[in-house]
């Protein structure tokens, strides 16, 4: 998991290691200069679909920063089409066609970009002219344009991956995104071995010289029209958490119980084992 905050174009980017521009974030002159300064300072960027395009001027659309290694050609001619996961970006996924349910962008990789995964077109678009009783036509097997491009400290995804995940929840979109996050941020602040339903939050109390780790595992169910409810608390067992910190830990306790927590240092991480998480557990990690 990754700690994250929502930001806008007027906020200070300097304290972040990575910015994510999802699907439809246009860039004006001021934001372009700000993103350039951010990357000059070592910052990294993930963007998808039409995010990062300069606001349209005289019918010309182009990406704000050449260092991203992509050239915009227009709206993709096929919907849906298919992406073929390969290499580190496709780690854990079979190297076969995975359907991308929403129309993406057609791009080319420039000499500053490296194509990680290609898109394959369908046999035809499902319209009144070429009808299929299924949701879409199958893949033709023909590669047509890049699906994922690695640039300078950046990755670009040609499809609106966040919109697709919001509408359809395909597991491969989440896996591709997580793989790319691991490539951009190989040493996250927090790692854990729990399921995706486990929420992990890490806070710092500087005056008290301690970190506060929250582990929450409540699964809401959509059983009514207006409200999601938690019917039962489902416990998790043998949860392990790794916290990256340059501070020297003195000890840890469960809060409010006050019981000691065993900690171990491993390659710059504090390793914590929690036997059981029943809804919520809080751990205070003191440092010097």
Regions found by a protein language model. Give the residues of each.
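Hydrophobic/aromatic beta-strand patches that form the interior of the parallel beta-sheet core
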Residues: 46, 116, 155-157
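A glycine-rich, often tryptophan-bearing local segment used as a flexible ligand/cofactor-contacting loop or short
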Residues: 25-103, 121, 178
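Short, flexible/disordered intra-domain loops and linkers
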Residues: 55-61, 166-171, 225-232
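Long alpha-helical segments found as membrane-embedded helices
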Residues: 132-139, 161, 191-192, 206-232, ...
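Helical hinge/lid and interdomain linker segments adjacent to catalytic or ligand-binding clefts
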Residues: 1-63, 126-128, 132-140, 255, ...
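Carbohydrate-binding surface patches
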Residues: 14-22, 29-30, 34-37, 141-150, ...
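Catalytic grooves of carbohydrate-active enzymes
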Residues: 5-9, 155, 161-165
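Catalytic beta-strand/loop cores that center a nucleophilic Ser/Cys/Thr
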Residues: 79-152, 165, 176-204, 224-226, ...
